[in-house]
Structure formats: structure tokens, C-alpha cells
């Protein structure tokens, strides 16, 4: 097998989780670390003693109703109507009691006809707010306070309907369940890809109406402790090869572990023993509603498999593409060095240095030999015109400097004899 070989064999998968590696190859058992994000995307954060907690929720009541859970929403929805009916029913009963309508005296014109008990007052409040209008109970001109209460209850009923029904519709329009159909692979993988060590995970959309476009982002969260024992969290972005995707079919997100990556100096053992968490988010727009959504997940060291790659899920048919969802979580074990990406780059540099040809020193030795030769060469070269350009391969043959030097020496010897 070559250094970057592609041979692999399928690992023995558990029957409960097809494609998952067996338990004995993941990592040794160790204490589970608290994670910031759960696998379903929910935050593992609890706020205690928030300054102005209830006041901030009441001021922004609409956002509070939209963000609350559906069971709490139904309780608030029911209590808002029931309490308003009870409050105004009590007011109408007090008006009737103060005016003497409960005595059933025919000489007294009641404030509200046919209200002789608290039950009757409650039913009148219910009919007024829901605009049922049975016609049996009605307010008269005898009491202006009763007329004013009917006006206030009508206005309050419109406000309650606006907030409660509007919040329910807004909560339905958010379609948070849409984020649950965007699925992240349970494991993240580290393996060789195009000759480079890469971190990979998979994202898939399993609804018929796919997302229009989406942006993937990943951050590495590292927990550190200072000398005083206080824990700090440091975030660092992971550069992705394909961060802008159209999720028609499952896509494998790739992060190349280069010199800018926080995983650059970590080998297989260091990754298994390190204390970090990789937070991944996917922000996308649905084609049915056109609203923006966000799906989240995270990976801790025990969920990162070294030396694996994902199985192929896409099959090319004659007229269409087939996605095998059973292979979404499947992975196979492939060859990958256990050293870090930093060590791989260092080995590659050493390999290139060893294969580089040695530097030739013929020119240097030739220059030294010429310097030791007779200085007549310098005499000839100094006599040449410095403005002349250097000779090219197309010029005619000229005498070498040594021949010129020999002629010059002969001329000097002849002149000396004369």
C-alpha cells in the first residue's frame, strides 16, 4: 500500500446501527465531558438569576409567546380567555348586586336584563366577548357603568385575539420542525482526501421540498483552565471547502486540516484525549415558505473517527438519481496515517529535500582557475569596448580570450626584442 493509498476494508458494524463502527474501536472509556450543544441542536445552557427576568419577558410579550412551547401556548391561550370572562363576569355581578338586580324586584329596572346570579353574569360576559349574542341577556340604559364595561370588554377582546391568535400563527409560520428534517451524521470522520488530511461530516435533507440554498459554518470550541481553576471557552472558525451548498442530495462537508486549522498539530491520540467541541450550523431557506431556518449539531472527540470515509449514497440511474438513505450514516475504514497534519507536511518537505539534485560547483571552480591564470586575459578583456553587446548564438565565430591573450603576448615579446 502506498503512503496515500486508497485500499480499505469494511468494518464490522453493529446490527442496531448499520454503518456505525463497533464500540471497541471508538476510544477507551473515559469521563463524558459536558457539551455546549446536544446532538439535536438544543443548547445545554441554563441561566440562573437573570436581571429583570420577568420584566423583560412581559415587555416583549409577543416574542415570548412565539418562543414558548406549544403546551405552554395552549395554557396561556385558554387562561387569557377564561380569566377575562371571569373578571368581567365578576364586575357585572358586582354592578347587579350594587344596583339591587339580584332581588328580582319588578319595580327596579336592571342594569343587565336576566342577570340574577353570578352564573348569569358570567354567561353575559362570555356572550359579550365572543359576540355570540343570544338575545336573552342584554345591557340597558339604566347604568352607565355597565355600558362602559361592555365597551372595555369589547376592546380588550380584540387585543387578546390579536396577540394570542397572531402569536399562534407566527409560531406555526416559523416551522421549527423543519429543522428536524435536516439531519447531521452522528459521527465526524478524519481521513485522507486528495492527499490531505481532512475532517468530514455529512448533511442531508429528507423532505420532498428541498432547501433553496444554505450556508454551513463550523467552529471549534476549546475549554481551558487558567492557573486559578477558572474555565474559559475559546472559539475558532474552521475553514470549509464547500460552505455554500444546495441540499438536493446529502452533501459531505470537508475541512482541510492545514496550517491555519486548530487541528493541525493533533494526531490520532491527541484528538481522542483532547477537550474540544466542534459546533456546526446550517442556515438555509426553504422553497415552500421562503423563510430562513437554522439547524445545529456538535461533535466531541469521542464522536470523531480517525481513518474512515462515508459510504456512497448517490446512485446514478438511467433517468434519475437515487439516494440510498440507509447509507447516510454508513462509513468504511480506510488507510490514514496516525500522525498529525503538521507531521505529514514536515515529512513531505523532508522527502522533497532528499529528492532535490545537488548543486553543481563547476562554475565556481572554473572561476577560481581563471583567477589563478595569467593576467593577460584581463588585459585583453580590458581592451574590449564595454559598449558592445554580448555575442549571441547567431553571431559569427570569434576567437576565444585565450587565443587573443596568446597573440598579445607574442606581440609584446616581438616589440621587446626590437
Curated annotation (Swiss-Prot):
Residues 95-117, 135-143 are extracellular. Keywords: Cell membrane, Deafness, Disease variant, Ion channel, Ion transport, Membrane, Phosphoprotein, Potassium, Potassium transport, Transmembrane, Transmembrane helix, Transport, Voltage-gated channel. Residues 118-134 dip into the membrane without crossing it. The chain crosses the membrane at residues 68-94, 144-171. InterPro entries: Ig_E-set, IRK_C, K_chnl_inward-rec_Kir, K_chnl_inward-rec_Kir5, K_chnl_inward-rec_Kir_cyto, Kir_TM. It is found in: Membrane; Basolateral cell membrane. Residues 1-67, 172-418 are cytoplasmic. It comes from the Eukaryota. GO terms for cellular component: basolateral plasma membrane; plasma membrane; voltage-gated potassium channel complex. GO terms for biological process: potassium ion import across plasma membrane; potassium ion transmembrane transport; potassium ion transport; regulation of monoatomic ion transmembrane transport. It is a multi-pass membrane protein. GO terms for molecular function: inward rectifier potassium channel activity. Inward rectifier potassium channels are characterized by a greater tendency to allow potassium to flow into the cell rather than out of it. Their voltage dependence is regulated by the concentration of extracellular potassium; as external potassium is raised, the voltage range of the channel opening shifts to more positive voltages. The inward rectification is mainly due to the blockage of outward current by internal magnesium. KCNJ16 may be involved in the regulation of fluid and pH balance. It is linked to Hypokalemic tubulopathy and deafness: An autosomal recessive disease characterized by renal tubulopathy with hypokalemia, salt wasting, disturbed acid-base homeostasis, and sensorineural deafness. It forms heteromeric channels with Kir4.1/KCNJ10; this interaction is required for KCNJ16 localization to the basolateral membrane in kidney cells. As a heteromer with KCNJ10, may interact with MAGI1; this interaction may facilitate KCNJ10/KCNJ16 potassium channel expression at the basolateral membrane in kidney cells. May form heteromers with Kir2.1/KCNJ2. Can form heteromeric channels with Kir4.2/KCNJ15. This is Inward rectifier potassium channel 16. It comes from Homo sapiens (Human).
Amino acid at each position: 500500500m502506498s503512503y496515500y493509498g486508497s485500499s480499505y476494508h469494511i468494518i464490522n458494524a453493529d446490527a442496531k446501527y448499520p454503518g456505525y463502527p463497533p464500540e471497541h474501536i471508538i476510544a477507551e472509556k473515559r469521563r463524558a465531558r459536558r457539551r455546549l450543544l446536544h446532538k439535536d441542536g438544543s443548547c445545554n445552557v441554563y441561566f440562573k438569576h437573570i436581571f429583570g427576568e420577568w420584566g423583560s419577558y412581559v415587555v416583549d410579550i409577543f416574542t415570548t409567546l412565539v418562543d414558548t412551547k406549544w403546551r405552554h401556548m395552549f395554557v396561556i391561550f385558554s387562561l387569557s380567555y377564561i380569566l377575562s370572562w371571569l373578571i368581567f363576569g365578576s364586575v357585572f355581578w358586582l354592578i347587579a348586586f350594587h344596583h339591587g338586580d339580584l332581588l328580582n324586584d319588578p319595580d327596579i329596572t336592571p342594569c343587565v336584563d336576566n342577570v340574577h346570579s353570578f352564573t348569569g353574569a358570567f354567561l353575559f360576559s362570555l356572550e359579550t366577548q365572543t359576540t355570540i349574542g343570544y338575545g336573552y341577556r342584554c345591557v340597558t340604559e339604566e347604568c352607565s357603568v355597565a355600558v362602559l364595561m361592555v365597551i372595555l370588554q369589547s376592546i380588550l377582546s380584540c387585543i387578546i385575539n390579536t396577540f394570542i391568535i397572531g402569536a399562534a400563527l407566527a409560531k406555526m409560520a416559523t416551522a421549527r420542525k423543519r429543522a428536524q428534517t435536516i439531519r447531521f451524521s452522528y459521527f465526524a470522520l478524519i481521513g485522507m482526501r486528495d492527499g490531505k488530511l481532512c475532517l468530514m461530516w455529512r448533511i442531508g435533507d429528507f423532505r420532498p421540498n428541498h432547501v433553496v440554498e444554505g450556508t454551513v459554518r463550523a467552529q471549534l470550541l476549546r475549554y481551558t483552565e487558567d492557573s486559578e481553576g477558572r474555565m474559559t471557552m475559546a472559539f475558532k472558525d474552521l475553514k470549509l471547502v464547500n460552505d455554500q451548498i444546495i441540499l438536493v442530495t446529502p452533501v459531505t462537508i470537508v475541512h482541510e486540516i492545514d496550517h491555519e486549522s486548530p487541528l493541525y498539530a493533533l494526531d490520532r491520540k491527541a484528538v481522542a484525549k483532547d477537550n474540544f467541541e466542534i459546533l456546526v450550523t446550517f442556515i438555509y431557506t426553504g422553497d415552500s415558505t421562503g423563510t430562513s431556518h437554522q439547524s445545529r449539531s456538535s461533535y466531541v472527540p469521542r464522536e470523531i473517527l480517525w481513518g474512515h470515509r462515508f459510504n456512497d449514497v448517490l446512485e446514478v440511474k438511467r433517468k434519475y438519481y437515487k439516494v440510498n438513505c440507509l447509507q447516510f450514516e454508513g462509513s468504511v475504514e480506510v488507510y490514514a496515517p496516525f500522525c498529525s497534519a503538521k507531521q505529514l507536511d514536515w515529512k513531505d518537505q523532508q522527502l522533497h529535500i532528499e529528492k532535490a539534485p545537488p548543486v553543481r560547483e563547476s562554475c565556481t571552480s572554473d572561476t577560481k582557475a581563471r583567477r589563478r591564470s595569467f593576467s593577460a586575459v584581463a588585459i585583453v578583456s580590458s581592451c574590449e569596448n564595454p559598449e558592445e553587446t554580448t555575442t549571441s548564438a547567431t553571431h559569427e565565430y570569434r576567437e576565444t580570450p585565450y587565443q587573443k591573450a596568446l597573440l598579445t603576448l607574442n606581440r609584446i615579446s616581438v616589440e621587446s626584442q626590437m
